[in-house]
Amino acid sequence: MSSAAVAASRRQSCYLCDLPRMPWAMIWDFTEPVCRGCVNYEGADRIEFVIETARQLKRAHGFQEGRSPGPVGKPGKDMQSINHAEPGSRPPQPLDRYPLTSDRPPRLGAEYQRQANGIPVPNGFPKPDEPPELNRQSPNPRRTGAIPPNLVPLVNGSMPPVHALNGRSVQMGIPPGALAEHVGKRADDMKDKHRADSMSDPSDGHKRVDEWTQKGKTVREMMTLQTLDSRFKKEHAALPHRMSYESSSGALKTDRGKHSRGIKRKTSPEPDGEGIAVKLNGEGQPWLPSPSEVLKMPSAALPGFAAAPPSTISPHSRTTPPEAATAVQNSQSPMAALILAADNAGTGSPKDAGNQVHSTTTSAAGRRNSGSPQSPSAGQRRPALGATGTAHIPGMDPQAGHPHSIPDSSVPPSSVPLCCTLCHERLEDTHFVQCPSVPSHKFCFPCSRESIKQQGATGEVYCPSGEKCPLVGSNVPWAFMQGEIATILAGDVKVKKERDP
C-alpha cells in the first residue's frame, strides 16, 4: 500500500459514487478504489459484483474512466502500449479509451464478448500486455484474476442488451444502417434466447432511454443492479401465495350461482365481507333454502355480519336449526366466549342462565306488548334453545308484534342480555348501575333512583337490591358515593329505551 501514501495529499474519486473523498475515507482492498460509504451501503460481500457491473456499464456506454492526467513517471514505451493497435492507426480520443472501431479487429477470444447490439467490447479481463489500468487517481493497479467465481457467467456473456444513448451509434464507429439491421436481427434472437438472469428487458430499455440519460451516474449504476433483485423478489414471493390461494379457492368454485361477485385474485388474499357471504350462503349448508330466507335471518347469528346495520326481523324468521346455533356459538371470538362465561358464572349454570333469560324476557315482552298474546311458535322454540344453552337475544324476540332493532353491536352476539334485577327491563349496555360485589346485580336508573330515595340520600345508601353486598375480600358492605347518588338522582338524565320511537 505504499502507492496510497503518494496520493494521500489529494482527494480520491470513488469508483462507484464518483465523488471526491479524503484518503482516509477510501478503501483500497478491492479491484477499484471505493469509499467507505459505498462499501457499507452495498456490503463487503457484494461490492466486487457492483464494481464489475459498474465497469461493464462504463465501458458499454462509453464513459470516460480517467479524468485525471496520466500517471506520473511512466515511460513513453508503456504509454504507447496502451494504444496497442497497428502503426498506422490514429490515437484514440478521450471517449475512445477502449477503441470500438475497425482499428482493432474484433476477436472472439476470452477477452471480448458480443453485446446484444452487436458491438464487441472488452469483458473486463485485462490483457497480459496491457499496463496496469489506472482509474481516476487510483494508486493501485487493477489486480489480475480478482473477479469472484460468481461473476464469471456475468462477464462471459450474460450481460443485458446495451442500447446506444440518444442514438449515438455513429460515435461507436458503426454505420447506422448496419446497426439497425444488426439490432433487428438480434431482436428476434433475444425473444428465444432471453435468459431469466438478464438484468433488464429490451422493452424497458427503449421506454426509459430518456429517463436513463437524465439521471446521475451513480443512480444509473444502482438502478441497473436493483432491477434484477426487485423483479425476482416480487415474482418469487408472489408465486407461492398465488398457487396456494388459487388451489384453495378451487373448492369455492363448485356452484356459486348468483352469489358469486367475481372476487379478484390477490397475491396476498385479504378477508372481505363478500367472500364470507359466499361461504355462508353457499350450497354447503343445506338448511338455508333460499337467499330470501337468509335475508330474514338475524345478523347476530352470522359471525361475519356481527356488526351489520340494524334490520327488521319478522316474528317467524328464525330458520337456524339447534345444531347450527350451537356451531355458531362455538365459532365466536374468544372475547365473546369469555364475556358469556363471566355472565354465566354470576348467574349460576348456563342452563339456569338460559331459563332466567327466558323468564325475564317473557315478563318484559308482556309489559311491552300491552298484553298482546304470544305467537304459538315462540313456545315451541324455547325448549330447543334451552337444551342447547344458546342465549336468547331480545332483538330476535319472536313474540314482538312490532319490529325491534338489533341491540348495540358492542354487545357480543349470543351473550346474556342485560336486564334489570328488580323490574327485569332491558338495560342499555352503558347506562345502568352495576353492583361491584355481585355480577348479577344490575339495575336501571329508575329502580336505582327509587332505591336511593327509599334508603335516604343523606345516609349510607347500599345496593338497590336491598342487600348489603360486601366488598370483595372484606365484610364491609359497599355504599354509593355522593357523586354517584347525585348523578343517579339527576332528573334530566333520561335513558332511551328500545320501545321509545
Curated annotation (Swiss-Prot):
* Residues spanning the membrane: none
Ranges of biased composition (kind: Polar residues): 311-320, 356-378
Fetch the InterPro entries from UniProt. Answer: I2BP1/2_C3HC4-RING_sf, Interferon_reg_fac2-bd1_2_Znf
GO-annotated molecular function:
DNA-binding transcription repressor activity, RNA polymerase II-specific; RNA polymerase II cis-regulatory region sequence-specific DNA binding; transcription corepressor activity; zinc ion binding
Q: Which UniProt keywords apply?
A: Metal-binding, Nucleus, Repressor, Transcription, Transcription regulation, Zinc, Zinc-finger
The family classification in the record reads: Belongs to the IRF2BP family.
State what protein this is by name: Interferon regulatory factor 2-binding protein 2-B
* Origin organism lineage: Eukaryota, Metazoa, Chordata, Craniata, Vertebrata
